[in-house]
């Protein structure tokens, strides 16, 4: 694809983020290019931080990136929701070993309504002043998979949606009363794939598009309540998460092939199937390994007096592609990037 070949060198440029600008540095090339668009929001770049961070509590979900520790260094009281805390597994043990009274792990499965309700009760009862509520909620619990539509089972679609979309909705609804008390923040981790579709990623894209829509609606509703809602749309950071190891990709592919209807296997053939799996392996190995732009985006959304509605921590290649895919006619963007 011509656009991919021409813009591939952009992958070698530093990760782009619209999170924070350093007043001491000159504008980046893309910022200069987009200055007329961004100038109206320029005052937000130098917005101050909220005060009394040390007395504010934040609940974080998803431990694949180290933002509980980063937010802890900012001075927040952290409640880290952990899927397997009761088993002493996963990231909860590492956080507990910090032996900090500001780092508190909580058993929380976003797919279990009763467990979510128990987490709300636990957080509410352990807040220093429950009437002041919970300052922030960071929704990042998620899973992913791959496979073209005809290769993907309905069970897989529902499994991914239950965690990524309904888990976000369920947890947000449960903790909103505490967030409203503090006039605090909701930060939902979406993805660039919540803005543009991608072949072989429909289960994931569907859920992230849903998170985007949910977050927009929530932002409209919460604005009169004084609650600010931000969306973080990371680019390709999959190489530093635990979502896709080579072994996991192979296991998913083998299971998918074994469960395909005979007519689908016959029509597509194993050669085509293996080619798509190989593309996924390449994608998983090509992402950025510096997650600091994502972590800084979350921190800015929680600490700035004027947080952004959307943050775009991603390579310039993906940022440019996202702008083209979302703003140009599909007849053009599809030709450039898909066909």
UniProtKB/Swiss-Prot annotation:
<comment type="subunit">
    <text>Homotetramer.</text>
</comment>
<dbReference type="GO" id="GO:0099617">
    <property type="term" value="C:matrix side of mitochondrial inner membrane"/>
</dbReference>
<keyword id="KW-0999">Mitochondrion inner membrane</keyword>
<keyword id="KW-0496">Mitochondrion</keyword>
<feature type="transit peptide" description="Mitochondrion">
    <location>
        <begin position="1"/>
        <end position="46"/>
    </location>
</feature>
<keyword id="KW-0443">Lipid metabolism</keyword>
<dbReference type="GO" id="GO:0005759">
    <property type="term" value="C:mitochondrial matrix"/>
</dbReference>
<dbReference type="GO" id="GO:0043231">
    <property type="term" value="C:intracellular membrane-bounded organelle"/>
</dbReference>
<protein>
    <recommendedName>
        <fullName>D-beta-hydroxybutyrate dehydrogenase, mitochondrial</fullName>
        <ecNumber>1.1.1.30</ecNumber>
    </recommendedName>
</protein>
<keyword id="KW-0520">NAD</keyword>
<keyword id="KW-0021">Allosteric enzyme</keyword>
<feature type="active site" description="Proton acceptor">
    <location>
        <position position="204"/>
    </location>
</feature>
<comment type="similarity">
    <text>Belongs to the short-chain dehydrogenases/reductases (SDR) family.</text>
</comment>
<feature type="binding site">
    <location>
        <position position="191"/>
    </location>
    <ligand>
        <name>substrate</name>
    </ligand>
</feature>
<dbReference type="InterPro" id="IPR020904">
    <property type="entry name" value="Sc_DH/Rdtase_CS"/>
</dbReference>
<dbReference type="GO" id="GO:0008202">
    <property type="term" value="P:steroid metabolic process"/>
</dbReference>
<dbReference type="InterPro" id="IPR036291">
    <property type="entry name" value="NAD(P)-bd_dom_sf"/>
</dbReference>
<keyword id="KW-0472">Membrane</keyword>
<keyword id="KW-0809">Transit peptide</keyword>
<dbReference type="InterPro" id="IPR002347">
    <property type="entry name" value="SDR_fam"/>
</dbReference>
<dbReference type="Pfam" id="PF00106">
    <property type="entry name" value="adh_short"/>
</dbReference>
<keyword id="KW-0560">Oxidoreductase</keyword>
<dbReference type="GO" id="GO:0003858">
    <property type="term" value="F:3-hydroxybutyrate dehydrogenase activity"/>
</dbReference>
